[in-house]
Amino acid sequence: MKKLRIFSVLLLLAAAAVFGAFRIYEKGIEDHDAPVIACQTDLISVSVSDGEEKLLEGVTANDSREGDLTSRVVVQDISEMQEDGTRQITYAVSDSRGNVGYASRKLQYTDYSRPVFQLQRPLMFPLGSPFNVCEGLTASGSLDGDLTDKIKYTLDQTISTAVEGSYTVEYRVTDSAGNTSYLQTSLEVYDPRDYQIDVELTSYLVYTPLNTPLDVGAYYAGADWTNEVALNIETDLDTSRPGCYYADFNVSDGTYSGKNRLIIVVS
């Protein structure tokens, strides 16, 4: 009986020793090293329409135990645009044990442009009628396409549809690169009895380059009126300075009159 107890104790000690040795061995082979990502260049130039395959061009990944992991590399993040016009793109890759490696490089676009606004109708609204300040206004960008649902605005005062007048409004829209475009202009609440003639324009908002002449009269499409009318264009346009300007198209047949407005952005 005594020999049996001694044998049991020895067996237990042997099992403990084997288990301990196994744990030490297992710990010795645990993988704590993250895969390493390498980028062929520090800067990649792409089109705004290029997908992830193009963004991964020249990127490889290798793990000390599992070897080549290039096929597992993903784009983890793209920062907002920096002052120099580039963004930082961050890549990530994970091995089978969950160790994650990262790498970053600069990204620049070959065809990027900031968001712009479009206007389908004049910012003129009749007295007594409810309206949406963003009515007829859309926005788009080369990077994201339609940005209309991202438009925000600020008014310098509360608008009353019962009081005619001009109200300053600033529209703004931001794309996924973090760039914000602004449109600071005015909208008008008018008495429809003052404007009996419908004045038609081909556009209601145009962009023109700095120091480039613009023929605002070319945007006049006519007046919906049976009698002959005289056209008078009033504008504060100065193409030598960036900013938002207007051109008012006033028509009259001597008795009745009409008006429409073109907004001009010089940039």
Protein language model features and the residues they cover:
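Gram-positive cell-envelope targeting signals
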Residues: 1-39, 50-51
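Serine/threonine-rich, repeat-prone extracellular segments and beta-strand-based repeat modules
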Residues: 2-12, 65-105, 109, 144-189, ...
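A short linear-motif detector with a strong N-terminal bias
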Residues: 15-18, 25, 39, 54-55, ...
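Solvent-exposed, low-complexity, repeat-rich "mucin-like" stalks and linkers
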Residues: 28-66, 113-146, 194-227
